[in-house]
C-alpha cells in the first residue's frame, strides 16, 4: 500500500476534480505533483470549467494515469465528452487517476492519506502533507513523550532551518520556490517563523 495523495481542484469554493496518486503523499512528492498540475491549469486559458476538466483528463492520460474508480466514472466522463476517446485500462494509479463526478470525487477522498487543494480563483494552494506544531516547545514535548531512544530528535530552535514560506498556505507563484527551499534545507524538520514542520518522507 502506498502513501495515497488526493489533489482537489476547486474554483469559487466548488470542487471540479480530484486526482489520486498512489505513491505521492510525501511532502516533496506532493508538491511536485501539485506544481505539474498548476502548470497544466494556469498555463492555458479555458473558456469554461468543462474545458478545464477535459484538459485535466487529457493531462492524466498523457502522464500515464487515467480515470479513477469503477465503470461508473468512465461512463460519466464519456457521456460529458461523447466525441472524445478514453481508454479504460493500461494506465497507472501512480501517475494520477481523475474523478469529476460528485460520487467519484467523494470516493477518491475516502482513499486519501494526504490532501492538497488547488484554489484556482484565489491562486493559492492548501497543503496538508506534513506534520505541524505551533512552536519548538510543543514539538520537543511530543518527542519527549515518545520515550527513551528519541533523544536525538529533540531540536534546538536556532538549528531548525527556516524555509521562509508557510507550508500549509502557498501562493501559486511561489510553489517552485517552496520546493527549492525545502530541498536546500536538507532536513526533515524545518520551520516558518516559530511554526515547526515535519516533512512526510
How would you label these PLM feature ranges?
Residues 28-33, 37-44:
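N-terminal interaction modules that seed assembly of large macromolecular complexes
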Amino acid at each position: 500500500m502506498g502513501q495515497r495523495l488526493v489533489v482537489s481542484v476547486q474554483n469559487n469554493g466548488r470542487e471540479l476534480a480530484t486526482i489520486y496518486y498512489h505513491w505521492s503523499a510525501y511532502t516533496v512528492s506532493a508538491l511536485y505533483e501539485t506544481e505539474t498540475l498548476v502548470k497544466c491549469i494556469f498555463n492555458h486559458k479555458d473558456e469554461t470549467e468543462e474545458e478545464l476538466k477535459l484538459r485535466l483528463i487529457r493531462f492524466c492520460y498523457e502522464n500515464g494515469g487515467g480515470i479513477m474508480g469503477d465503470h461508473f466514472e468512465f461512463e460519466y466522463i464519456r457521456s460529458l465528452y461523447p466525441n472524445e476517446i478514453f481508454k479504460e485500462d493500461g494506465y497507472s494509479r501512480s501517475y494520477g487517476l481523475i474523478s469529476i463526478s460528485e460520487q467519484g470525487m467523494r470516493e477518491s477522498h475516502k482513499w486519501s492519506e494526504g490532501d492538497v487543494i488547488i484554489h484556482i480563483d484565489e491562486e493559492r494552494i492548501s497543503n496538508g502533507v506534513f506534520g505541524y506544531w505551533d512552536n519548538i516547545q510543543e514539538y520537543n514535548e511530543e518527542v519527549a513523550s515518545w520515550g527513551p531512544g528519541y533523544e536525538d530528535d529533540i531540536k534546538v530552535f536556532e538549528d531548525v532551518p527556516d524555509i521562509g514560506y508557510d507550508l500549509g498556505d502557498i501562493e501559486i507563484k511561489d510553489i517552485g520556490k517552496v520546493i527549492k527551499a525545502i530541498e536546500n534545507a536538507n532536513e526533515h524538520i524545518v520551520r516558518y517563523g516559530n511554526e515547526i514542520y515535519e516533512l512526510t518522507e
